[in-house]
Regions:
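Bacterial N-terminal signal peptides
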Residues: 1-2
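N-terminal secretory targeting modules
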Residues: 5-119
């Protein structure tokens, strides 16, 4: 579970101690975290009205985005080059909890998260 320390208006690497991953993951020397198993999820608290992630994907994967326990939607991850993807925006002010969960089987793609940015 994520700790109570939230980040705001800054970028943090995926391996930050305030970001927790559940499932089989590979932590990289550059601060990125990769995974391909269905059901793997990342959870963290953040302060702000939006959150984005810098990701890459070997193949194609779908992830469900939950904010404060509510399913916000499903996002498609594609593209081998790192790029930014908005996970949620137009949220109320304050601290929120993000949960991003892979819902695609591993043979369809391997996801890598480099960082998160809250705004």
């Amino acid at each position: 579970m994520a700790t109570s320390v939230a980040f705001a208006d800054r970028t943090v690497k995926a391996n930050d101690p305030n970001i927790s991953f559940t499932g089989r993951v590979q932590r990289m020397d550059n601060g990125a975290v990769s995974y391909d198993w269905v059901g793997t999820y990342v959870q963290t608290d953040f302060t702000g009205s939006s959150i984005a992630a810098r990701v890459s994907e070997e193949g194609e994967s779908y992830h469900q985005v939950f904010i404060d326990g509510k399913l916000m939607g499903k996002l498609r991850f594609t593209g081998k080059e790192p790029h930014d993807i908005v996970l949620a925006k137009n949220l109320g002010k304050g601290t929120h909890r993000l949960r991003l969960q892979k819902v695609t089987e591993g043979e369809y793609g391997r996801s890598t998260i480099f960082s998160f940015t809250a705004g």
